Curated annotation (Swiss-Prot):
Biological-process GO terms, alphabetical: cobalamin biosynthetic process
Protein name stated in the entry: Cobyric acid synthase
CDD domains, per the entry: CobQ_N, GATase1_CobQ
Active site annotation, chain numbering: 334 (nucleophile), 421
Gene: cobQ
Record's function text: Catalyzes amidations at positions B, D, E, and G on adenosylcobyrinic A,C-diamide. NH(2) groups are provided by glutamine, and one molecule of ATP is hydrogenolyzed for each amidation.
Organism: Mycobacterium ulcerans (strain Agy99)
Pathway the protein takes part in: Cofactor biosynthesis; adenosylcobalamin biosynthesis
Gene3D superfamilies to which the protein is assigned, alphabetical: 3.40.50.880, P-loop containing nucleotide triphosphate hydrolases
Domain spans labelled GATase cobBQ-type: 253-429
Family indicated by similarity: Belongs to the CobB/CobQ family. CobQ subfamily.
Sample GO molecular function, one term: ABC-type vitamin B12 transporter activity
Keywords: Cobalamin biosynthesis, Glutamine amidotransferase
Domain of life, per lineage: Bacteria
Amino acid sequence: MPGLLVAGTTSDAGKSTLTAGLCRAFARRGVRVAPFKAQNMSNNSMVCQGPGGAGVEIGRAQWVQALAANATPEAAMNPVLLKPGSDHRSHVVLMGRSWGELASSNWFEGRQVLADTAHRAFDDLAARYDVVVAEGAGSPAEINLRAGDYVNMGLARHAELPTIVVGDIDRGGVFAAFFGTIALLSVEDQALVAGFVVNKFRGDLDLLAPGLRDLERVTGRQVFGTLPWHADLWLDSEDALDLTGRRAASAGAHRVAVVRLPRISNFTDVDALGLEPDLDVVFASDPRGLGDADLIVVPGTRATIADLAWLRARGLDRALMAHVAAGKPLLGICGGFQMLGRVIRDPDGVEGPVAEADGLGLLDVETTFGAEKVLRLPRGQGLGVTASGYEIHHGRITAGDAAQQFLGGARDGQVFGTMWHGSLEGDALREAFLRETLGLTESGTSFSAARERRLDLLGDLVERHLDVDALLALARHGCAPALPFLPPGAP
């Protein structure tokens, strides 16, 4: 099948970024290209339109990769989405719809259904597009997971996909990681690995060249290029690993503190705030981090009651109360909004074992979780402007008399709560909100234009630093025969 698998030496090696960059570069050549990830484990997701106009849910990274490919996002691009609610339990989204829960103890019992669905989705995309660029997960050399793999080499074997391995040289040890990744694969899997891409290189490329030549010599595989480290190159993140890379506060700007909840979800909601020139966005997990904030955001979460208990245990509830008492603005989004209400009920254990918990009482609303997940793309009025967003939640909101309506949520003075993810990506709503809460004037920032510039920048870097023609030929025609075997192979 025409396609390519982008595997990585580790998590966060650059698979999502490289996949998006290849999609943009191939699309520029007139190729009808689609992104794909068989299984994504992330609480950052997006709603797109499914059959009949119904909402379907996919990983945020695949949604952005579809934008890079100039393709319409769809459930087949991320057929299995796992949303961790605890260290041992994940909510499963199958072809965009809620499927159920899987615990680590019964993971292998449900794996075959997920694998079959994922491989059918890939085959469907491959039949409709010229090339499918598939992103792997973690590393293909996780020998403890090999038997159940359908995301990395399991997918590559299914579709006979040539595979490239990307490694983050900024972490160090990339040559050992490249060699070791291949050397732990079986003979059959090694035959599908065509070569490497080095990611996040800083410095003089001439100093790296001898190492690249040696890597090609000892592995018998091509290095397709080296992507430079670039400070402005960040895309919608897949998981919380990327939170550590957010910029720190600088003097003079209004400080926005985002509560870093243990099961934080859709933290891309604040990306648009990070582009505003008069704001500095930081993530905080203790009261000191919230103390001097001009605006606090409590984001979404996959475990609302559990994260509310964590928030109280760390004294963050008192910090939020003090912030509101000082007349400063507070915004809660989805699960964060539900925490600001009077009570949260989960009688059926949708999110966890605790059936009921008192909220912070800052908004006159109550939340009750139901089994059916709401997936919507709402549009309406807020703060005098047209706004839009997306909803992904099990919670049903009941508002009291004191609650003033705000974007599917409620407002009381400077305390705002909304069920709409992504509303701040709308320039008009964001400007109105910042004017209302912080007194800021319009900056002229366009979030959608900024995202498109980043995708173009990524495409430019891929075109400039990688052998795109060779990668496209690889995707169309597959690996060269008789690639050398690196011992010891699969244990």
